[in-house]
Amino acid sequence: MNNFIFENKTKVYFGKGGVKEYLGCLLGNYGETVMLAYGGGSIKRSGVYDKVMGILNAAGKRVVEFDRIMSNPTYAKAQEGAKLARENHVDLILAVGGGSVSDCCKVISAQANLDEDIWEMQYKKHTLPTKFIPLSNTLLFTPSSCISVFPGRQAVLRMDCKRSGSCSR
C-alpha cells in the first residue's frame, strides 16, 4: 500500500424531504448561476424536477440546464457540460440523479476552469489545478463517492479529485 493523505470536508445530508429542507438554505452560499444537471426524463416524471426548480427560482438563481446525461456518460458529454458551464459562468453545479450524472458532473467541475484537456493532464507530470466549480449532488438511490470513472478513447479516466487538487489514475 502506498502512503497517502485523505481529507474529506464533505457534508452529507440524509433523509426524506432533505432536498426541500436543505437545498434552499445552502444556495445562498454560492453565486447566482446554477447548472442543473440530470439524465433522462425520470426526474420530470417523478416530480423532482419541479421541486428543485421551485427551490432554485425561489432563491433567485439563474438556471442553466444540462440534461440527457446517459448511463456511463462519455467523455465528450462531460466536455460538452464543461463548455456550457464555462460559457455561462456557472457558480454551482447541482447534479440530480444517480451515479452517472454524478460522475459526469465531477469531470465538468474539474474541467470547466481549465484551458488544458483534463484527459491529457493525467499523462503529464505537473501540479494539477485546485479551482473547481462547487458541486452539489442530489443522489437518488446511489451511494456518494469522490471517484469518477470514465470510459474514453483507449483507456479509462479514473478521477479522484480531492480538495488538494490531486488526481490519481
Which sequence ranges carry the predicted segments?
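An N-terminal, well-structured beta->alpha segment
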Residues: 1-65
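Short coil/turn connectors at secondary-structure junctions
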Residues: 9, 30-32, 61, 87-91, ...
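A generic local structural motif
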Residues: 20-24, 79-81, 120-126
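Glycine/Thr-rich phosphate-binding loops of Rossmann-like dinucleotide-binding domains
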Residues: 22, 44, 103-104, 144-145
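Short glycine-rich anion-binding loops that position phosphate/pyrophosphate groups of nucleotides
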Residues: 40-42, 98-101, 141-143
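N-terminal small/polar loop signature for handling phosphorylated ligands or for N-terminal nucleophile
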Residues: 47-117
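A glycine/threonine-rich phosphate-anchoring loop and its flanking beta-alpha core
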Residues: 114-169
